[in-house]
Amino acid sequence: MDRNINLPEEELKYIKECCEVLYLPQPTRMDIIGVMNDSDISWNENLIILMSEDGKIYVYDDEALYKVADTMEEFSEIGLINLGNEVYHCREDIKPLPEEDRDKDEYIMKIREKARQLIDNSQKDFEAILDSLENKHVSI
């Protein structure tokens, strides 16, 4: 486990906030205590290890939160043996933010800006790909 977490602080904050309110039946404060970096064990190459306010240890990976131990002591003894026994998926009863709230959300605005930059910077490439596809379609 790597305590020198090599993920952007903004991404870690977002993951932590999501784990606190979107996965467990009741909102629960959590702290990130480490990250396991290993593409062999995780789809996204990072298992985020969290401790809840009641001392339970969870692992976040690929849109699921796994309870792996009831205490830090238990976690240090058994590691990830219980991974998969107790799985929490994002709650479906949460309604999306209204557009006016999304327009005020800093994180969403940054994502939108990055997407706009990608589109603007890649416009010529997109057009070339479309032209290529259209020419192939006509040739067939």
Curated annotation (Swiss-Prot):
In its UniProt entry, what is this protein called?
Uncharacterized protein FPV250
UniProt cross-references to Pfam families, sorted A to Z? US22 (PF02393)
InterPro entries for this protein:
US22-like (IPR003360)
Which keywords label this protein? Early protein
